[in-house]
Amino acid sequence: MGGQKEMADSVKTKLTGKLKAKKVTAPQAKAFSVHLLTASGSFLAFLSVVAASDGRYTAMWWWLGLALFVDGIDGPIARKLEVKYVLPNWSGELLDSIIDYVTYVLIPAFALYQSGFMGTNLSFISGAIIVVSSAIYYADTGMKTKENFFKGFPVVWNMVVFTLFIVRPGEWVAFGTVVASAILSFLPINFLHPVRVVRLRPLNLTIFLLWCAFGVIALYYMLDAPLWVRIGISVTGLYIYFIGAIMQLFPSLGREAALAKARKLVEKQQKSGEAP
């Protein structure tokens, strides 16, 4: 009996020790909450699929817009909380890529096919081009440049298809846009990241926010937007589409302002370090 009791106590001690060792810390809980925020994009994607299946495209784009907002804020929060180092066994990058493929690629391709505004055949072919080319693009580990530009069209099909839904160009113009963008995914041409690219950041971010504003107005009109909205979203969209290549051709464009800002930041950090 004594031996059994000692064995039971030993097992209990080991289990208690393991449970104590696995105690969740406050930083870990905060870090995991960021992963939950990122994962919420999958539910938003589900809601957008349901809406698209019912032909409620305005609702679908609202859900995808909310998913885009979540995708825009989870990264900065994750870096601030150092999630990658606090929870090294959980890959925020992989989770983000999975949800991005669904919200940026798969659902817009489905909506393009489901709506049929390019005609049945062209819509089907366009959807196939989008999902296959994007899957290959996501496998590229060198999709970012040193300046945080995307190398090649960054498969932001949610923005492209959304613009097509609002502007409603001819079916062959829309099809040509899809084909050209898919080809550009694999060419060494820079595309803008409106937040992470330092050069011309104030201007680029302003144009991006204007594009978002025109998009919200278009959704208010249930995608049947007036001409000024269609012109606005087209002009801002074309700027976002081409400015990366223009800045690649003219590498000095906006560089002085970016360097001056970097110098001020370094000086501020140095002064902060010298403070008692």
From Swiss-Prot:
EC number(s) stated in the UniProt entry for this protein: 2.7.8.24
InterPro entries, A to Z: CDP-OH_P_trans (IPR000462), CDP-OH_PTrfase_TM_dom (IPR043130), PcS (IPR026027)
Catalytic activity, as annotated: a CDP-1,2-diacyl-sn-glycerol + choline = a 1,2-diacyl-sn-glycero-3-phosphocholine + CMP + H(+)
GO molecular function terms attached to this record: phosphatidylcholine synthase activity
Keywords on record: Cell inner membrane, Cell membrane, Lipid biosynthesis, Lipid metabolism, Manganese, Membrane, Phospholipid biosynthesis, Phospholipid metabolism, Transferase, Transmembrane, Transmembrane helix
Regions of this protein lying in the Cytoplasmic compartment: 1-30, 79-91, 137-146, 193-202, 252-276
Protein name in the entry: Phosphatidylcholine synthase
Origin species: Brucella melitensis biotype 1 (strain ATCC 23456 / CCUG 17765 / NCTC 10094 / 16M)
